[in-house]
A protein has these predicted regions:
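Residue-level hotspots at or immediately adjacent to binding/recognition sites across diverse folds
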Residues: 32-375
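Secretory targeting and sorting signals
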Residues: 1-32
Length: 375
């Protein structure tokens, strides 16, 4: 994700608003007179723009321009991930060097249509039969593998072709975690062994999280700040509340998502914000497990956040705006659609999203992979 903070693909895998209305009429003039007309403003909404009947779902998406982007189809089981390229507003399948097995694209990020990155989750190579995670780059004409990691990737930030950050997830018991890695265009360097996700502003300003802490990298060291008091109270004996995603937009505008980790339904979900001096909790909703890295800015001060309640068979796309979390309207509703990734179209309040439709309250039946657009 490019400065953005996914639902684990093993369970199901780069968020945000009822946005500004667009003017739809232009003034007309005749000789000696002038007149203007104004039609009703178009109300933005989510709509499906691509559907693929398959047993898999779209796991990641990135907008690379107003009418360009990439999306990735797969479920991490047997078949290799498949890429779709958006050009001129039309999605088409494109060549991609995916590998069969437990590989799925967990995140995608870009700085331009000719600098696009895809990151596969992998299962880790610490145990027999495990698969590596990979970082792949598209230069405008072809994809190539840049780096292979022995542990799973959870997300990434891409600032330039020579400024790429990759973040791991919490390792299984007895398995090492990937931590945080930086790529300067020639060399990969591990800068943390404990960071579980992150979002970069520059090579010397990176935000990450680990459990109840948010951490900041200044180019030389990490500084941790506990936000435990801002998270929901512990709801069960099995899982602790924790930070699950972070999105840095500027030095004084950093967002984090926390979750209470209730055993069955997940939640509550909280929105945290850093204004350059302190962290505060701005909103809370009694919804399911908040998605990790791929939540998105809505381009107008809010967020789009993916959210899931597996036991209830529901998936919500939440919108944060002006201190409130609300459930966004999606084409098939929360019982028949799941959104796994959201990406802001650069310079706009429009969004691309990736996910699936499925049988009512059943993520495993009747799957149709879908791509959506908010405009």
């Amino acid at each position: 994700m490019s400065r953005k903070g996914a639902w684990p693909i093993a369970v199901a895998a780069g968020a945000a608003g009822l946005l500004a209305l667009a003017a739809v009429a232009a003034p007309a003039a005749t000789a000696g007179t002038a007149s203007s007309s104004t039609g009703p403003a178009a109300v933005p909404k989510w709509r499906i723009t691509e559907s693929v009947k398959t047993s898999a779902n779209f796991t990641a998406v990135v907008a690379t321009g107003r009418t360009t982007g990439w999306a990735f189809l797969g479920n991490g089981f047997n078949a290799a991930p498949v890429a779709f390229q958006l050009s001129g507003g039309t999605w088409k399948k494109a060549p991609f060097p995916g590998t069969k097995g437990d590989e799925a694209v967990i995140d995608a990020a870009a700085t331009s249509p000719s600098d696009v990155w895809a990151f596969t989750e992998g299962t880790g190579t610490s145990f027999p039969g495990g698969t590596p995670a990979r970082a792949l780059h598209y230069n405008g004409s072809k994809w190539s593998v840049v780096k292979t990691f022995g542990e799973p990737i959870a997300g990434a930030s891409v600032l330039a072709a020579n400024d790429v950050w990759v973040f791991g997830t919490m390792g299984f018991t007895g398995e090492p975690a990937l931590g945080a890695w930086h790529y300067n265009g020639s060399t990969w360097t591990q800068v943390s062994k404990t960071i579980q996700g992150g979002s970069a502003l520059s090579a010397s300003s990176v935000w990450g999280f680990n459990g109840v802490n948010v951490e900041h990298w200044n180019g030389a060291k990490w500084t941790a700040t506990s936000v435990k008091s801002l998270l929901p109270p512990k709801a069960n004996v099995d899982m602790d509340p924790q930070v699950v995603g972070i999105l840095a937009l500027s030095a004084r505008n950093v967002w984090a998502i926390g979750n209470g980790q209730d055993t069955d339904e997940g939640g509550p979900t909280v929105v945290l914000h850093y204004n350059g001096s302190k962290w505060t909790r701005l909103a809370q909703a009694n919804r399911g497990f908040a998605a990790g890295p791929e939540f998105s800015s809505d381009g107008s001060g809010g967020l789009w956040i993916q959210n899931f309640s597996p036991e209830a068979g529901t998936a919500y796309l939440l919108h944060y705006s002006a201190g409130k979390l609300t459930v966004a309207a999606v084409p098939d509703g929360p019982t028949k659609m799941a959104v796994y990734a959201v990406s802001q179209i650069p310079g706009t309040t429009q969004q691309l999203a990736a996910g699936e439709t499925h049988a009512s309250r059943n993520f495993g039946a009747g799957i149709v992979a879908v791509l959506l657009k908010y405009s």
